[in-house]
A protein has these predicted regions:
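Adenine nucleotide-associated cytosolic modules
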Residues: 1-217
Length: 217
């Protein structure tokens, strides 16, 4: 087993993970979850890998021109060929899951995030948890929602025009994207293993300050 060293710490094998957006955040969390023992995934992204993606995501130059979903599937299968992956090369239009799954939002656009949350809120079997990761070059933000509603999400949402100059911009760094995957994977481990987790975290690389709020125990 590839997760021999972590299987007693994190048993996430019974969870289906939905990764919406397979760019910097999505590719990082997907590959880390595979290494941690995740074995059932649904990947959503309509875009293709471009050269700038190589510098901030889990892709390489051989992936350029491929769909992000296809390229990420290849990388995940190279880690563990036995995992199950459903790839949807399209925008998120409806939720392919049930109430016990976990969904990760890793998009660049705040408006796209809100549209997805509105779709999820209408689902009879929405995911048990939605983890919203937002990153810039030097700062990462993360919000966790259980039984998500639009009203709940609006409290932490802002428009693309009013967004912070850091999170969800075109600027990005490899270390911030890798750390985003680590934060999300750790939060998922805590949720699944019924350990305490923070519903909101903000980490700034320039100051190395981690701000944590709303501890759930």
């Amino acid at each position: 087993m590839i997760n021999t060293r972590s299987q007693d710490i994190a048993d996430i094998s019974g969870i289906k993970f939905h990764i919406v957006g397979c760019g910097a955040i999505g590719s990082s969390v997907a590959t880390q979850l595979v290494r941690l023992g995740g074995n059932n995934f649904v990947l959503y992204d309509f875009d293709k890998v471009e050269i700038p993606n190589v510098g901030v995501s889990q892709y390489n130059e051989q992936d350029v021109g491929l769909s992000k979903v296809g390229a990420l599937t290849n990388h995940m299968k190279k880690i563990n060929v036995m995992i199950e992956i459903e790839g949807i090369v399209d925008k998120f239009k409806y939720y392919h899951g049930d109430k016990d799954d976990i969904l990760v939002l890793g998009l660049d656009s705040m408006s796209a995030r809100m549209e997805i949350v509105k779709l999820l809120a209408k689902c009879p079997y929405k995911p048990s948890f939605v983890i919203d990761g937002r990153m810039g070059a030097e700062q990462y933000q993360q919000y966790i929602y259980d039984n998500i509603t639009v009203k709940q999400y609006e409290k932490d949402w802002y428009s693309d025009e009013d967004s912070d100059p850091e999170p969800c911009t075109r600027k990005a760094t490899s270390y911030c994207s890798n750390m985003s995957g680590s934060f999300i994977s750790n939060s998922i481990k805590n949720i699944v293993m019924k350990q305490p987790y923070f519903k909101q975290i903000i980490f700034n690389f320039s100051t190395m300050i981690l701000d944590k709020k709303k501890l759930i125990s």
